[in-house]
Amino acid sequence: MPSVPSDEEFLTYNRGVIDEFRANHGVVTQPPFPVLLLTTTGARTGRRTTVPLGFAVDDDGRVYVVASKAGGPKHPAWFHNLRANESVTVELGAGSFEARAVVTTGEERDRLYRRVAGDDNAYAKNTDRVFPVIVLDGVPTPASGMHISQPQKTG
């Protein structure tokens, strides 16, 4: 099973990805899959915070992310933030979009999760929690090849 990075390791890694993303109009060398930047408003602090996330696109062209935190025992902070305030900013490629974060449930959540995780997701083996799947309503469908169509790793 993969190990779960510490919060400090996540922060250090994420800072590098964010800087590279913005310097190269949405193109990064690591991780080895396309990412978007999600900016949420802190539930307690009100401060805007940005994280890089892998993403997928469903059959209807909706962009979505999974709150896996590498299989950590708790949901990532960005997920708690968007539950308190569903208004988010998404940077995708060279564009920036205001969006509404919609937490999926039931069959829709399961279907979208299976689409990216498959039947044997290593992150899921690290924890008993169910990974939330969030549709980013208002983000246009990215260009072909700019999204993940196989199992992914998200923050």
Where is each model-derived feature located?
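Extreme N-terminal tail/first-helix region
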Residues: 1-30, 143, 155
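Generic, well-ordered alpha-helical segments
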Residues: 13, 30, 46-47, 70, ...
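N-terminal short leaders/motifs
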Residues: 1-12, 40-47, 87-96, 142
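Short beta-strand segments
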Residues: 32-68
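C-terminal edge-of-domain segments
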Residues: 2, 122-155
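Short helix-to-loop capping/linker segments positioned immediately adjacent to catalytic or ligand/cofactor-binding
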Residues: 25-26, 45, 121-124
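Short, structured beta-strand-loop surface elements
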Residues: 68-132, 138-139
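A short, polar/charged loop/turn motif at coil->beta-strand junctions and beta-hairpin connectors
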Residues: 29-32, 130
